[in-house]
Amino acid sequence: LGGETAEMAGFYASGDYDVAGFAVGIVDRKNLITGEKITAGDVILGLPSTGIHSNGYSLVRRIISDNHLTLKETYEGFDKPLGEVVLTPTKLYPKLVLPVLKGADVKGLVHITGGGFYDNIPRILPEGTRAVLDADKWPLLPIFSFIKVQGGVEPREMYRTFNCGLGMLLILSRGEAEKAKKILKNIGEAVYEVGTISEGNRDVIVTGGLFHE
């Protein structure tokens, strides 16, 4: 079992309090996806996010405050006001992932939440492997370029803090990855082949994307 309490520095005033909820999941031990079967040559598929999801808001609020940005203004690159962009609801993935689990052998699943790519992916990697991602392989949502420029955030820190356009990663062998792509296409979900597993030391390499800017 695991859990956390969100750190919301500068958000709560004296006398405020937080009401939190939780969910408990159950899985048969034989169906656990532990990542232990991941090997060099496996493929990494990515499912798109809808925005910043539920992580990085303290940094976003600081950038908005420091740059005197207006939540009601529609800035260049957006089709709606900034306030609506940052509050875009978090995408949920169970209805997309469950059909894949039934039709393909998924070796690893990674939810890109707090800690981004660099902290979340190693949790599923076995010893002797490395995840190599090409950020040019998936669309970068405008909000992430906006945050990087307005906040002067280094690319590596962006990929450590935010999902940068991908909310869920699936790791499969080449043949099983093709099955997964077909399943996701049939249910109308976009999916991108964003990287591979190579030999390494349970680390992550990201190239392209925000590193170009």
PLM feature spans:
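Glycine-rich anion-binding loops of enzyme active sites
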Residues: L1-S58, T196, G209-L210
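Glycine-/charge-enriched secondary-structure boundary and capping motifs
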Residues: Y12-Y17, L71, E76-L87, K91-E213
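Acidic, glycine-rich loop-and-beta core segments that form the ion-binding/anion-interacting portion
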Residues: I38-E84
